[in-house]
Structures are given as C-alpha cells and as structure tokens.
A protein has these predicted regions:
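C-terminal cap of metal-dependent C-N hydrolases
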Residues: 27, 38, 369-371, 375, ...
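Histidine/acidic-residue-rich catalytic or RNA/ligand-binding cores of hydrolases
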Residues: 89-93, 133, 214-216, 253-259, ...
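Histidine-rich, glycine-flanked metal-binding segment
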Residues: 29, 33-75
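Metal-associated gating/positioning segment near the N- to mid-region
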Residues: 72-144, 159-167, 227, 251, ...
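His/Asp/Glu-enriched, well-ordered alpha-helical/loop segment
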Residues: 98, 238, 242, 304-307, ...
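Active-site gating loops and adjacent loop-to-helix segments of metal-dependent hydrolytic enzymes
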Residues: 86-104, 116, 160-178, 212-226, ...
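Alpha-helix-loop-beta-strand connector modules within alpha/beta enzyme cores
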Residues: 138-156, 220-245, 282, 286-290
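Divalent metal-dependent hydrolysis catalytic cores, especially in the metallo-beta-lactamase
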Residues: 108-132, 146-156, 201-214, 242, ...
Length: 422
C-alpha cells in the first residue's frame, strides 16, 4: 500500500500543471514605445506569459478566460525605477525609533497594491529597513500579496553621519537603529556591497551626496570620495549588480558618473560638467520630479524640521532644469519618482512633468518607463513590451497616451505576471 501511494504521489508531482489561458480583446495595442500602435488585436496569455499578439478579434479557445478591453488602449506595464514602498510621506522622523521593521512590511504591502493599481508592474525599491524590501519582493513574486515585481536594494550604503545613516536621535538610540550600512574607505565600501549582495539585494543603492529629508545639515554636496564610489561600482559590477546613486550636488553627480555608477537619482544641481560625465560614461538619469512636488506640498506646514525645510527651499528653484539639459545632451532618461516622498499611486503624474518641464515627447516619456527601464534592469527580454515570450505585464487606459500623456494617470486594467490586480 505504501509503495502504491508513493507511486501515485510521484505521478502527481510529475504531471504538468493545468495551463491557464487568458485571451484579451484589445481595441488598440501599443506593443512598445516607438512602435506603430496596432488596431483591434487579440493577446493570448498562458501561464503568465504572452503567447501571441494577433490582428483582429480572434475567438478564444475552449476553457480560456476572455477579457474584453475592446474600448481601451492596451500597453506594457509601467516601470518606476525609484520608490520606497515601506514609506509614506510625512515628517515624523522619530517614528523610525519606535516602529518595528515589521510595520514596514504592512505599509509596504498596502503601497505595493496601490502602486500596481496605478499601472506600475515593476518597481525598483531603493532604500528600506533591513529585510523589509526583500520580504515584499518575495511576497509579490510568490503571489502572497498583490503588487508589482520588485527589485530591492535593502538599506542604502552611506557615509558615517551622512544621508542614509541614522541621525537626529541621542547617540545610544542612533547606535541601536544602525543598519550597518555605512563605510569609510574603498575596502570597507566594497565590503558593504558584498554584504548587501549576500543579504539579498538585487541592486545597490548609495547616497553619493547629502539628502533633503534626512536630519543631517551638512548640505547637498558630495559625500563619498571618488575612490570609494569606484570601489562600490567595480565590486557591484563584478557581482552582476547595478548601482543607483542618490545625488543632488553637481560634483557628487560628476564623481558618481566617472566612477561607473549606473544611474543618478534626482540629479538636482547637475551642471554642464556633470551632464558631460554622464553622457561620456553612459550613466542614466532618473529625475524623480514628483519628489519635489511632494516636498513642496508639505513645505511650511509643520511637517518638516527646520533643518529639512532649509534644504527643501534650496532645491525648489531647480525643478526640471537638470532633466531638460540632460535630455538635450542625449543622456539616457529613465522613469523614476521617489514615491513615498509623495503618496504612492500618484506615480504617473511624473510623465506630464517630464514632458512639460523636461522637454520630452510623450513617446520618449513612455519609453523611459518601459523599454529603457527594462534595459537598465537587464530585463529587456522579460518586460517593457507586449510580445510573445514576455511576461504578461499589461495595462489598459481610455484614450491615447501618445497624444495625451496624462491618460496614464488613470489606469483601468492591470495584469502582473498574468495575474489581474484587483
């Protein structure tokens, strides 16, 4: 009897899983930014992957689930290259000292769903407490919580006392909250990269300059030395990881680019020399214009400390200038918002700012959140297009985002990895 049961179990394990097929009837399809849109089409999805994109309305096979989007424009799911899922906007920095890391998972699960509903099917989570981002990544990947595909850095690597290090509390409280993410000198900084990789990071985040929302008042200039940043970039690349650098000040931006950092986040005060370095080194720019909307909306309302407010005021006169200059210079622009500094779910408002302030066309803006972002994630054969073999990351909107980019601010349908987001 035992042998018979074991045989039945073996057959059950060996048997192929039932193939789930879904058929989407689309009124119009943007298969990729820059490609001519298709008219009425039928998209077939099996087990989370796109099998075919066929002109016209094709009858669904027996047993397939049909999804009627015949009045919609269907396009690839969007990518936000800079979010903080476990954070919500506000200035109560002291909560860092009283709330457990586990609470970040609860907040992150809420924000993962909100983000996916907004049409963002892949995000790069750049900075979270210890294992929070990694747990969220696993939760959405295994279908335990609804949300986007998550690329996570874990805690950002920073200098001692800089943006990303714990500050603003009594020394003994700072010590308890320390995430072990600071370094001094190339050797120690390389070790931090190796530790991050060991802990589960699939991207490295550093704070190359001072930051706006931290309690340190040392300005927004360069923090890491050039040799430290080169050690970080070289070590990460040797491990197959890309590096994102939070950077506001011009010299920090230039230094990060020349060190081989892959993406510059914010880039607020980028000057001609910094942009030249980015272009020469192939460093991409993630402008996060919505971050400035978030901090401007809260300025003077008692949300931020005086230290933070002084830095906020320093940045507001520059919004969009660096993006415009970088775009004109031919620097690769990648969509990213810094969601968490403003409310999650408003991510798509970044598109209009990229067009209106940055001089980009709607097609360029859409590419920055699809094909270009996919390439920077080394996932250009997985996401960013509606094509056979790609993950079924699909959204639908009413109207034409190539004519009015604000159309993307209201998404009517979202599918991530073949699963419809409720």
């Amino acid at each position: 009897m035992i042998i018979r049961l074991m045989g039945v179990a073996a057959l059950a394990i060996a048997a192929p899983a039932y193939a789930e097929t879904q058929v989407i009837h689309a009124g119009r399809v943007i298969t990729a930014a820059g490609s001519a849109p298709l008219g009425e089409s039928t998209i077939t999805v099996t087990d989370g992957r796109i099998v075919s994109v066929t002109p016209g309305r094709v009858p669904a096979p027996a047993g397939a689930t049909e999804i009627d989007l015949s009045g919609k424009t269907v396009l690839p799911g969007l990518v936000d290259m800079h979010v903080h899922l476990s954070g919500d906007p506000g200035g109560d920095f002291w909560k860092e000292a009283v709330e457990p890391d586990e609470w970040g998972v609860v907040v992150g699960a809420k924000n993962a769903l909100v983000t996916a509903r907004a049409g963002f099917t892949t995000v790069r989570d750049l900075g979270s407490a210890r294992d929070v981002g990694f747990v969220l990544r696993r939760g959405t990947a295994e279908g335990m919580i609804p949300g986007p595909r998550i690329i996570s850095s874990g805690p950002a690597i920073s200098i001692i006392g800089g943006h990303g290090d714990v500050s603003g509390f009594r020394p003994e409280v700072n010590a308890v909250l320390d995430a072990g993410n600071t370094c001094t000198g190339p050797e120690q900084c390389a070790a931090r990269v190796r530790e991050a990789s060991k802990n589960g990071a699939n991207v490295i985040k550093i704070t190359a300059t001072g930051g706006v929302l931290s309690q340190q008042g040392r300005g927004l200039g360069q923090h890491f030395t050039d040799p430290e940043m080169k050690a970080i970039a070289d070590t990460a690349h040797g491990l197959g990881l890309r590096v994102a650098a939070h950077a506001h000040g011009a010299r920090g931006i230039e230094g990060a680019a020349r060190a081989g950092i892959d993406t510059i986040e914010h880039g607020t005060f980028a000057d001609a020399a910094a942009i030249k370095a980015m272009k020469e080194k192939g460093t991409a720019y993630v402008p996060t214009l919505m971050a400035f909307t978030g901090i401007r909306d809260r300025l003077g309302k008692g949300v931020y400390t005086p230290t933070v407010e002084a830095k906020v005021r320093e940045t507001l006169g520059t919004i969009g200038k660096a993006l415009n200059a970088a775009h004109e210079a031919g620097v690769t622009i990648v969509f990213g918002t810094d969601a968490g500094v403003f409310e999650h779910g408003r991510n798509a408002e970044e598109f209009a700012q990229m067009v209106e302030l940055g001089g980009m066309t709607p097609t360029e803006a859409l590419a920055s959140a699809t094909t270009t972002a996919a390439k920077l994630l080394d996932m250009e054969n997985e996401i960013g297009r509606i094509a056979p073999g790609y993950s079924a990351d699909i959204i639908a909107v009413s109207g034409d985002p190539l004519a009015d980019i604000r159309t993307l601010e209201k998404v009517d349908f979202v599918m991530v990895r073949g699963k419809r987001i409720p």
